[in-house]
């Protein structure tokens, strides 16, 4: 099962978090399937990639309690109910500190959610179509050169 959760970054006592889609059995710092935004609890600044979040929620990803509260504040669930598809590329929730430069809008995804869910299942290591072992990797045709024997000097 895929979870939407926080991945910790930052220095000691100065945490920042990235909101990621990750396999539920993976460790907190594990490799995510996709990064979907970030959250800074010190300044309360949050940036969410709505298209990616909506895609994962449609696929059945389960948000943790903290991510769920961030999604509610941003209005992601209303977008999901209304059926909006990634009309807004990113949402920036105002912070207490100075806002950073805007994030460039990514190109809208043309993939169907079902196809994306299947592709993410393959990436997560779930059963699916698997290539034969011979087709996945070809053997290296270069052979290492043998080392030359050095003459031994008797002392």
UniProtKB/Swiss-Prot annotation:
Listed Pfam families: Ribosomal_S16 (PF00886)
Keywords noted in UniProt: Ribonucleoprotein, Ribosomal protein
Any one GO biological process: translation
Start and end residues of each stretch annotated as Disordered: 100-155
Cellular-component GO terms for this entry: cytoplasm; small ribosomal subunit
GO molecular function list: structural constituent of ribosome
Domain of life: Bacteria
Biased composition range(s): Low complexity: 124-143
Gene3D superfamilies, A to Z: 3.30.1320.10
Transmembrane residue ranges: none
Similarity field: Belongs to the bacterial ribosomal protein bS16 family.
Stated name of the protein: Small ribosomal subunit protein bS16
């Amino acid at each position: 099962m895929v979870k939407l959760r926080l991945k910790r970054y930052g220095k000691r006592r100065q945490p920042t978090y990235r909101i990621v889609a990750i396999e539920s059995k993976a460790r907190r710092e594990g490799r995510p399937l996709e990064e979907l935004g970030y959250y800074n609890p010190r300044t309360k600044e949050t940036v969410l990639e709505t298209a990616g979040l909506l895609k994962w929620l449609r696929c059945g990803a389960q948000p943790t309690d903290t991510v769920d509260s961030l999604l509610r504040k941003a209005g992601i669930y209303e977008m999901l109910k209304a059926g909006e598809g990634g009309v807004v590329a990113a949402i920036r929730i105002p912070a207490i500190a100075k806002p950073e430069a805007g994030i460039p809008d990514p190109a809208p995804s043309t993939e169907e959610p079902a196809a994306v869910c299947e592709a993410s299942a393959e990436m997560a290591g779930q059963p699916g179509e698997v290539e034969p072992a011979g087709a996945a990797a070809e053997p290296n045709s270069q052979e290492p050169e043998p080392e030359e024997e050095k003459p031994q000097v008797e002392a």
